[in-house]
Amino acid sequence: MAIKAEEISALLRSQIENYESEMSVTDVGTVLQIGDGIALIHGLNDVMAGELVEFHNGVLGLAQNLEESNVGVVILGPYEEISEGDEVKRTGRIMEVPVGEEMIGRVVNPLGQPIDGQGPINATKTRPVEKKATGVMDRKSVDEPLQTGIKAIDALVPIGRGQRELIIGDRQTGKTTVAIDSILNQKDQDTICIYVAIGQKDSTVRANVEKLRQAGALDYTIVVSASAADPAPLLYIAPYSGVTMGEEFMFNGKHVLIVYDDLTKQAAAYRELSLLLRRPPGREAYPGDVFYLHSRLLERAAKLNDDLGGGSITALPIIETQAGDISAYVPTNVISITDGQIFLQSDLFFSGVRPAINAGQSVSRVGGSAQIKAMKKVAGTLRLDLASYRELESFAQFGSDLDEFTAKKLARGERTVEVLKQGQNNPLPVEHQVLIIFALTKGYLDDIPVQDINRFEEEFNHWAESNATELLNEIRETGALPDADKFDSAITEFKKGFNKSEE
C-alpha cells in the first residue's frame, strides 16, 4: 500500500489545528515556618480569607492571616510530616461539610468525616461552614414551646423553638446532663438533635453517645466531636460545622435542637490560635473579636417565617464558670448574646437539689410566650414562691419560734424544692409536669411528708397513666388547663390509696 504525501500532510495539518493545550495553572506557595498547628506560607498571593489550602501530604489548612509578605494558615490535621520548604497549593474552595439525612445517627469530626467505625457516609450535599445568619425579615418571633422534660426548666425558664438559652455553671454541676436530657425528651417530637462536643475526653463523649444509643435518641441525633486530643483549629470550627448541618434541616422546614458543649473550650482554642498567629491579645488574653466568634455562631439559631417553611434551630450553648464567676469575659459575652440563661449552682448540687438550677438567677427572655397555657397557669407563682422560701429559709435559721404563716410558707417551699428535683436521664412529659405542679401549687401536697414527695409523684404518674388518661390527653392535645374539678377528683382519688410513711 502506497503512502501518499498529501494524506500525511493533511493529517498533520488537522492534528495541529485541533491541538488544545490542557495546561492547568495552580497558585502555589512555600512553607516558611511550621509549628504548633500554624504554618507561615510565602506566595499564595491571590488566596481568599478562609480558603482551604492543601499541603503535599493531602492535609488541609485554613488561610487566616493574609499579610503583605506571607499567609498564616491553621492546619486541620496532623502536621508532623510538613516541613519547611514544602509546597502548598490553593484549592479555590472555602471550607464545607457534608449535610443531610445521611448524617443522622453518626458520630463525625468537625470536617464531617465519620469517627464511629461504621463505614463511610454517603452524603450527596455540602454546605459552607461560615455563613451569614438569617436576616431580620426572614425570621419570626418564638411562639412554639420546646419541651426539655425537666420540670424546673419547663415551669420556670421555658424554652421556645428558635431560642438561644445558655446553660452556665461551674464544673460538675450537671450542665451536660441537662442538655442530654433535653435531647432525650425530643423523642417523637419531630426534632433533629445535634450534640457538639468541644474539647472533651474521648471517654466522656463515648459515654454520652452510649447514653443516647440506649435511649433510642441516636435515631434523630448527629454527634460532632472535637476531642481534647484534636488540634485547636478543629475545636474552633466544631460549633460552626454543627450549626451548618442543622441549617440544612431548618431550611427544609424541620425543627433542630443543637447543644454546644462547651463554648468556653472553643474560646480557649481560638485564643490559642490567635496568639500563635501573633494577633494582639486583649482582656484575659482573648483576641478582640472573641465576642464576634460567639455572636456569629449563636445568631444562626433562628425561627424562620412561614414563607421559608417555618423551620427552626434552638441552641443550648454551655459555658463553664470558675467558682461561680459569671462576670468573667466569655460568660458575660454569651449572656448578652443569648435569650436567657439557666444558672446551675454547685452549692445546690452538693446539697442534693438536682438539677441544681438557681431559679433566682435563671431567666428566659422569650420562652414565656411559647409556654403552653396549662403550664403558664399552674406555674405562674412558682418562681415567687421559691424566692420567698429561700429568703425565709435564711431567716428561719436564726429563730425557732415561727408564726403559722411563715411555717406554712416554709413547708410549701420544702415541697416545691422536692417536686422540682428530678432523676438523671428521666425526662417527664409536659402533661405529667402540669399534673404534679397543679397538686403542689393548690396545696394538695401540704399534708404529704417531705420525704414522701418523690415517691408520691412517681406513683401518681403511674396511676394517672391508667386512671386519668382523659385528663392527660386533654393537656397534651389542647395545651389548655382542664377544669379544676377534674384535677381535684383525680388527685383526691389517688391520695385515698397513697400510703404515707410514718413521720
UniProtKB/Swiss-Prot annotation:
NCBIfam families per UniProt: atpA (TIGR00962), PRK13343.1 (NF009884)
InterPro entries tied to this protein: ATP_synth_asu-like_sf (IPR023366), ATP_synth_asu_C (IPR000793), ATP_synth_asu_C_sf (IPR038376), ATP_synth_F1_a_nt-bd_dom (IPR033732), ATP_synth_F1_asu (IPR005294), ATPase_a/bsu_AS (IPR020003), ATPase_F1/V1/A1_a/bsu_N (IPR004100), ATPase_F1/V1/A1_a/bsu_N_sf (IPR036121)
| Name of the molecule in the record | ATP synthase subunit alpha
- Per the UniProt entry, the Enzyme Commission number(s) are 7.1.2.2
Q: Which keywords does this chain's UniProt record carry?
A: ATP synthesis, ATP-binding, Cell membrane, CF(1), Hydrogen ion transport, Ion transport, Membrane, Nucleotide-binding, Translocase, Transport
Disulphide bonds annotated for this chain are: none
**PROSITE patterns, from UniProt?**
ATPASE_ALPHA_BETA
Q: Where is this site: Required for activity?
A: 362
- Job description of the protein: Produces ATP from ADP in the presence of a proton gradient across the membrane. The alpha chain is a regulatory subunit.
**Short name of one Pfam family for this protein?**
ATP-synt_ab
Location of the protein in the cell:
Cell membrane
Catalysed reaction(s) here are:
ATP + H2O + 4 H(+)(in) = ADP + phosphate + 5 H(+)(out)
What's a single GO MF annotation on this record?
A: proton-transporting ATP synthase activity, rotational mechanism
